[in-house]
Amino acid sequence: MHKPRVLFLGRSTLDVLYRLDRMPEEDTKVYARELQTAPGGPALNAAVAHSLLGGRAMLISAVGGGPWAAPVRSQLRRHGVRLLDLARGTAYETPLCTVLANAANATRTIVNPPVSQVPLRHLGASWAAEMPSSWGRIPPVVLTDGFFLEETGALLAACKSAGAAICLDGGSWKPGTEELAGLLTAAICSERFAVPGQSGGANGNSDAVLEWFANRGVPYVAVTRGARSILASDRGRRFEVEVARIAATDTLGAGDVLHGAFCCHFALKPEFELALRRASEIATLSCRGPGAQAWARQPGGTVAESPQRALRSSL
């Protein structure tokens, strides 16, 4: 089986994770059950998940410098994820995010730092001119999380023109999403994704999201809803993907794992429903342990064989 190649574009962070028995009340002090720091961000986590499944991952992101950049770069090297840093040579610093994980109901709350105003590199439309030669040709699948669209829009359009499937990790609406829709092959959105002027939040209008993308020519659309079934549309055909019931201990990064696994499967066999079902299984598995990578590790700390076997069995 060849290694599927996928390009990921979007955000990288360093997350400081506090695992709590329950969320604290306002104006109180509490002690965490556990403290963990780990690189994060939708695109980074998806790229690492793709790599753990045996794929070749390339990441275009802003990492820059500052005290938090080193662990991010170290993790990418450890997992063989190749990086093109939009912030190279600038004063940009890797964002430090605080994550409160509530063990009582397996939810998480994230506090982001202020948005950086440091100008980043804008990529042109020529893959050969912009990318390292070692990256080879344009990959068959490209995922964007909606961050840095201004800096990467021309390259995304070039990838689309070359025949790549452009996929969106729609965690939330971001500036440029409407223009991006015309390039998309697939949009996989959170239930919190809301088109401006439409209802959103935890009980957002999933049907409206499916219709909005379909009306703009996106053939494959899905809305994830946590532990509830995934609602999806394959060129107008509606279906649901049931999510296995488990005793979830941590949902942090599960959506990112789903996107990385989807891209890995879709790059091998471009069948939307099959790739979505396989990705859902792996994302559910990721909720059994702490963090966005515990699903792929045995107790001894080595990468488990089961994810790769699951990938091969889907062919």
Set out the residue ranges of the language-model regions.
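Active-site metal-binding loops of divalent metal-dependent hydrolases
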Residues: 12, 147, 257
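Glycine-rich phosphate/adenosyl-contacting loop at the front of the ribokinase-like
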Residues: 1-62, 70, 78, 110, ...
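Hydrophobic anchor at the start of a short beta-strand
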Residues: 6, 56-57, 83, 166, ...
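Conserved phosphate-binding/catalytic region of the ribokinase-like
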Residues: 1-6, 203-315
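Conserved N-terminal subdomain of the carbohydrate kinase-like
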Residues: 28-29, 37, 52-140, 303-315
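Conserved phosphate/ATP/ADP-binding segment of small-molecule kinases
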Residues: 153-240
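Short beta->alpha connector loops
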Residues: 65-66, 146-150, 170-174
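Structural motif
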Residues: 7-9, 112, 141-143, 167, ...
